[in-house]
From Swiss-Prot:
It comes from Arthroderma gypseum (strain ATCC MYA-4604 / CBS 118893). Its EC number is 3.4.24.-. This is Extracellular metalloprotease MGYG_03559. Zn(2+) binds at H188, H192. It is found in: Secreted. It is an enzyme of class 3 (hydrolase). It holds the Pfam family Peptidase_M43. Residues 1-19 form the signal peptide. The keyword Glycoprotein applies. Keywords: Disulfide bond, Glycoprotein, Hydrolase, Metal-binding, Metalloprotease, Protease, Secreted, Signal, Virulence, Zinc. GO terms for cellular component: extracellular region. The active site is at E189. Glycans are attached at N101, N220. The keyword Methyltransferase does not apply.
Length: 275
């Protein structure tokens, strides 16, 4: 969405659009808006550039209620296919994901959204530059996935340990989730890990939006896969229903925009690289 903003207006507004309730539980905080303001301003001034390719070490954590796929115990093949989907989506934008390790845990409480912090304290691997993906049978908010936005936490603190995405296991390739079993929930949540908002952040507002200049304004998340949609008719452009950061069906989502790619590169460089 094209935008203009000031730090004062940004904080005072408190306008943080809620995600489509059945898809994504990630919610940006005002602190994240403030932390990322310099990058937002840099991109608005078109002063950014694509950096050298970034390889992200990725740790898979399968957390299930039993050793049944129905209870979240997805196979190594499904994880390999998920990694392939991630790399296909992000490779054109300067990112690749390298498998670091896989853990498997049977814990009915953790597998159904309970005691998340202790789960992550027990399972978290690597550094802040790395990516931890937790595949569970059910999330506490019944969404398909959730992922904290980047910040500047101290190692070992809850904010550091909670970093990483929690994903509904049935959304991986070959999973059972209707219209969302091609692995794009994970692609979407990694977008938040990289600092992207939803494309419908801020709704039809011309002041806020998703802080990316080449995604048209969008009132709310897309349901299904319409042939076309224009939820902000007074703003230029049609809804970006094919964008990975919308909430369309998996079959509908195929792209990031160039400005989204630039934002991810800048955000990773600022908040994660070397940390």
């Amino acid at each position: 969405m094209r935008f203009s903003l000031s730090l004062i207006g940004l904080v005072a507004s408190g306008s943080l659009a809620a995600a489509h309730p059945s898809h994504c539980g990630a919610e940006p905080s005002e602190d994240f808006d403030i932390l990322s303001k310099d990058i937002t301003d840099k991109l608005a001034a078109e002063a950014s550039e694509i950096h050298a390719p970034i390889e992200v070490t990725t740790f898979f954590h399968v957390v299930a209620s039993s050793k049944s796929v129905a209870d979240g115990y997805i196979s190594d093949k499904m994880l390999q296919d998920q990694l392939a989907v991630m790399n296909k989506a992000y490779a054109p934008h300067g990112f690749s994901f390298k498998h670091g390790n896989t853990t498997r845990t049977i814990n009915p409480t953790w597998a159904t959204g309970g005691d998340e912090l202790n789960m992550k304290y027990a399972l978290h691997m690597g550094k802040y530059a790395d990516l931890n993906l937790y595949f569970v049978k059910k999330l506490a908010d019944n969404s398909h996935g959730s992922c904290p936005y980047p910040s500047n936490p101290y190692p070992g603190t809850p904010g550091y340990i909670k970093d990483g995405c929690t994903i509904l296991s049935s959304t991986v390739p070959g999973g059972s989730q209707s219209n969302a079993n091609r692995g794009l929930t994970t692609v979407h949540e990694i977008g938040h890990y990289m600092g992207l908002y939803h494309t419908f952040q801020g709704g039809c507002s011309t002041e806020l939006g998703d802080r990316v200049a080449d995604t048209p304004a969008q009132k709310n998340g897309t349901v299904g896969c319409p042939s076309s949609r224009d939820s902000c008719p007074d703003q230029a452009g049609l809804d970006p229903i094919h964008n990975y950061m919308d909430t369309s069906d998996d079959v509908c989502r195929t792209e990031f925009t160039p400005k989204q790619a630039m934002r991810m590169q800048e955000m990773y460089k600022e908040f994660r690289a070397g940390k």
